[in-house]
């Protein structure tokens, strides 16, 4: 069996683990935002995680009524621009938690006073250290750059 097929078959178990383990943290976030609602939500991701962000954009706008946009990380990394994310919720999605572009968006967002959330598979990753709140996907590790199966639990995390 290929690694990708193995990852795909493990998605239901990973999803169940994520929901069971992260439910209290997500409920805490919901309560926090009921008191102080962000004006907009920014999602930052690269590669297959960007697919999860695109799907999440639809779900979050429908569920919250808050405008959601995808960040363009190269605005920071290539052009050194400053973007004001004050009053925003900025969510970075990275399977490894080591995407330089995604992490830079999260760092800049924190500097602006945004509330930051990281969605990752790695509890000890750079992303997990930067984010104020972390949601662990708990999927099998993704090897190399091919991605594929690892994005499924990220997509479902949004539901």
Language model: regions and residue ranges:
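Glycine-rich phosphate-binding loops that contact phosphosugars or nucleotide phosphates
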Residues: 34-159
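Cofactor-/ligand-binding subdomain signature composed of acidic, glycine-rich
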Residues: 1-37, 116, 144-146, 155, ...
